[in-house]
Amino acid sequence: MFSLKRQQGASFEQQARLFLESQGLQFIAANQNFKCGELDLVMLDGETIVFVEVRQRKNDHFGSAVESVDWQKQQKWINAASLWLATQNHSLEDTDCRFDLVAFGATASNVQWLKNFIE
């Protein structure tokens, strides 16, 4: 079950990457893991580094994909982005970046792209 869930997650992350590339973003990295959390995708939109969280929900019984990104998850996302930037000799303070959410429903065609999900 865990392996199937991981495979499905990887599939939706790939769909998100393709979707974002079709919107003009450039791929930088995927699945960047840190103790504090993971960055699903790191993309470039012009001069802006975009940290992308990919979420999928088959139904809304336990909340939507968007609702699943709570305050605690947002903090992990920000911390992981900060650590990733440090590996590039940058910081959140000196880098033009944003946090986008790509949320899927039951299928890859049911997609929402929420730019600046974390302000």
Swiss-Prot record:
InterPro entries given in the database record: Restrct_endonuc-II-like, tRNA_endonuc-like_dom_sf, UPF0102_YraN-like
Cystine pairings recorded for this chain: none
Pfam family, one: UPF0102
Gene Ontology MF term list: nucleic acid binding
Family, similarity comment: Belongs to the UPF0102 family.
HAMAP family, sorted: UPF0102
Record's protein name: UPF0102 protein MS1289
